[in-house]
Amino acid sequence: MSVSTIAAERRTIQLAIDTGVIALRGLSPQRSRFELEYALERGSTANSVLFAAGDVEPAVLVHPPGAAYSSVFLPVLAEQLADADQALLVVVGHVNPNRVALLRDLAERYSKLELIASNAGAKVLAELWTQRKPAPPGQEVEQPPLPDL
């Protein structure tokens, strides 16, 4: 199965936990039996929690997925947080290049994005933030600045 076919089959579902608390679970039919496949080291799902506090307090997003889920995750998040000027705190539990790519997308959309990470995580975030694949001459893309940590 091609990478584009697998990506097209991914989706993000919303599970209301309580008023203002929403679980955003990224699913793939290729990984529908999470516990068994995880035990066999064949993959996992992407599970995030959004605390939407309303207009007064910032929203808090815990453990956003990596870029592999960006095409299905970002539109669902935008439904919940339509105001791009709303403050958004993002708790980053583990850092890798795939996750940093999605965080860059969030930084482009939400101008008041703040990242929350451990000291070690913040150092890795700062190093990975500016890394990118080389672009052909004349096709360089401006990246958003690293949000406050």
Residue ranges with predicted function:
Residues 1-3, 43:
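Intrinsically disordered, low-complexity segments enriched in Ser/Pro/Gly/Ala and basic residues
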Residues 3-11, 15-19, 110-149:
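Metallo-beta-lactamase
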Residues 11-79:
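Conserved beta-strand hairpin/beta-sheet module of binuclear metal-dependent hydrolase folds
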Residues 26, 100-102, 120:
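Generic hydrophobic alpha-helical membrane-span motif
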Residues 31, 95-100, 122-125:
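Active-site environment of divalent metal-dependent phosphoester hydrolases
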Residues 41-45, 79-83, 109-112, 134-138:
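Short, low-complexity, polar/charged sequence segments that are solvent-exposed and flexible
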Residues 46-51, 85-88, 114-117, 140-142:
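Glycine-rich loops and low-complexity Gly/Arg-rich segments
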Residues 65-116:
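Active-site metal-binding motif and surrounding structural segment of the metallo-beta-lactamase
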